[in-house]
Swiss-Prot record:
Organism: Oceanobacillus iheyensis (strain DSM 14371 / CIP 107618 / JCM 11309 / KCTC 3954 / HTE831)
One record GO biological process: lactate metabolic process
Protein role: Is involved in L-lactate degradation and allows cells to grow with lactate as the sole carbon source.
Gene name, Swiss-Prot/TrEMBL: lutC
Domain of life: Bacteria
Cited InterPro entries: FTHF_cligase-like_sf (IPR024185), LUD_dom (IPR003741), LutC (IPR022823), NagB/RpiA_transferase-like (IPR037171)
Signal sequence residues: none
Any matching Pfam family: LUD_dom
UniProt protein name: Lactate utilization protein C
Family membership: Belongs to the LutC/YkgG family.
């Protein structure tokens, strides 16, 4: 991305501060108090899962814990509970690892099953809009707030978790972190290590919730009405 007028802007800012512009020797300050690192510090993965499960009750999200072997069966049960007839899922490399590629092939025998296909462009969004359920993997999962982090790219469109009536997030156990602090650091570290960050990183916390000035809660206005988190050991 091109940068325009940066030097002019910074020089003008320094002049208004009454000092020369600093171009080197600038370091991020170390704050004496950093409580963000103390929340759930030292918690095990199982303890973080317990925190996530408890918070799912607050954010109106169904929580299921299962094994990798049972995942396709649990996903199928969830789809049936939602009475879904059409599904859209991400074209994630983890589909094969977790047995979901075979599961999707089986679903396609009875349901309208679509795997995100970069070659058809915006047609994916049209399909997502009509789908009953969207399914994708969480890349980083925040236990404290019950948030899944979705790194959207050409094989994992944002529409999967946004447009269908219901959404299923598959959460590998190892993606659990205490809170936003660790998620932000992980994304930052990836960038500093030369790992390309997707243009869209979405933090999704349960179903869409909106409230007016009288605190009347309305679910599903800006996203899914139903959300299920499936944690996989």
């Amino acid at each position: 991305m091109a940068i325009h007028n940066r030097d002019k802007f910074l020089s003008n800012l320094a002049a208004n501060l009454g000092r020369p512009r600093k171009t080197e020797g600038v370091e991020r300050p170390e704050y004496s108090v950093q409580p963000q690192y103390e929340v759930l510090k030292g918690a095990s993965q199982d303890e973080l899962i317990d925190v996530l499960e408890k918070h799912c009750e607050v954010i109106h999200t169904d929580f299921v814990r299962t094994s990798k072997q049972e995942l396709p069966h649990v996903v199928r049960q969830t789809i049936e509970r939602y009475e879904a007839k059409s599904i859209i899922a991400s074209n994630d490399k983890r589909n094969a690892e977790y047995g979901m590629d075979q599961a999707y092939n089986q679903f396609a025998e009875e349901l309208d099953m679509h795997i995100w296909d970069a070659s058809i462009g915006k047609e994916n969004q049209v399909i997502a809009e009509k789908a009953d359920v969207g399914i994708s993997f969480s890349d980083i999962t925040l236990a404290e707030s019950g948030t899944v982090t979705l790194k959207n790219d050409k094989d994992n469109g944002r529409s999967i978790s946004l447009m269908p009536k219901s959404y299923i997030a598959i959460i590998p156990k190892e993606t659990l972190v205490p809170r936003m602090t660790q998620a932000a650091k992980q994304i930052h570290d990836d960038h500093m290590n030369g790992i390309q960050t997707p243009s869209s990183v979405c933090f999704v916390t349960g179903p869409s919730n909106s409230a007016d000035i009288e605190m009347n809660l309305i679910v599903g206005v800006h996203g899914p009405v139903n959300v299920t988190y499936i944690v996989v050991d």
